[in-house]
């Protein structure tokens, strides 16, 4: 039986993949913080659910809706979850394939903070430059 926080993250990533942004939003604490490393157009620290949702909309805009996350695994306990996935996208004739790790902090059944880690940040920065 999976940990409830594993289910939470798996459901969120599946909802993101379906474009069900209402379901994605419902998983977030209102005061969520989301950290995207690098220097590209989507890099930065997003404070609050509204800013995070705007960042997701910007990601879809920049990639023409091609961004996808192929989930490999989720590891979870009572306070954290870690998702391992491969991100893929196309933009301006460029293609991105990047193995990514998201580290989630979970509070009261909601995602309260996320740290993204990329295996090839140079490629991600170039893609989103």
Annotate the PLM regions.
Residues 103-125:
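Short beta-strand edge/turn micro-motifs at domain boundaries
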């Amino acid at each position: 039986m999976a940990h409830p926080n594993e289910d939470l993250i798996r459901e969120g990533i599946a909802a993101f993949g379906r474009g069900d942004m209402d379901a994605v939003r419902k998983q977030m604490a209102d005061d969520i913080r989301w950290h995207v490393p690098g220097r590209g157009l989507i890099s930065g620290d997003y404070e609050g659910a509204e800013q995070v949702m705007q960042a997701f909309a910007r990601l879809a805009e920049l990639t023409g809706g091609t961004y996808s996350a192929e989930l490999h695994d989720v590891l979870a306990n009572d306070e954290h979850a870690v998702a391992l996935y491969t991100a893929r996208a196309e933009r301006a004739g460029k293609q991105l394939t990047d193995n990514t790790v998201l580290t989630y902090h979970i509070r009261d059944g909601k995602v309260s903070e996320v740290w993204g880690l990329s295996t090839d940040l140079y490629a991600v920065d170039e893609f989103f430059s």
